[in-house]
């Protein structure tokens, strides 16, 4: 696979789509990861950029994978304009950071103040979180995400679905009242009576007693919710279109992914819960990172995500070569729009094609 991530901003007109498809094709790419926002499902449009992209790409012999944000439902910058967006309709689904949990607990979840405080905290901590996330621990939120995937795969003849942001932003997230209640209810059915009574007595003074007292179980619970979501999304996509290839963005370091983001991608690979892993590799030791992934991927294909927007043309070509040496079955470059814009320009992609894909 030789793929490009393509942002929505590159799909605004038929002509911009034509230029993008032509540029990708002539540069030797064979796949497009096309960004589709959460609001796209079911939206009424006079011009359908996704449908037009698929038509033009398939005509040119390119495959198209839908690039979907999953748990992250809104970026931390400009909030969605539409008032029927999930963050306004269901603020109770949003993950709450541990640092804000006690402050939000007495606030009515449906009051503007609740969402306002969460947004302000998110914007003041952009080094830790890049937006608003829904909790996979809540059945309604998981169903919402599954239905969004179902609708997109049903509407479009996609070749694949790339699931982005299938993770917790950090290990100290998802301390909302409903997520903690779900964990508490599960643990109450498993704990010996005396231990349950002890923690219940602590909870009378500390509403976060269950995650505090059962820290490892709390981590395992959230990790399991994320894994269950991955399984459900893949099953949903394939139930609509069996040939759909489902890939997942993963943190390249498996231990860090599990520790910091509760993203147990080794289990996903070992149990064939996904069709392909897509780690974003950074830094000088690309070969080392990808060799580790190859060793842990349990035979699952993996595609190296390369941030070419931060690299020179030579560095990008070298990164592609390193990915191939490490056993990657494909590469995905970030991103079309940044690679054709100044200071790079249109020759950047064609140069990569000549340097990395000649003879492919």
Regions inferred by a protein language model and the residue ranges of each:
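Boundary/entry segment of secreted carbohydrate-active catalytic domains
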Residues: 1-20, 24, 250-253, 309-310
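Aromatic-lined substrate-binding rim segments of carbohydrate-active enzymes
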Residues: 21, 34-72, 221-240
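Substrate-binding cleft of secreted/luminal carbohydrate-active enzymes
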Residues: 273-292, 300-360
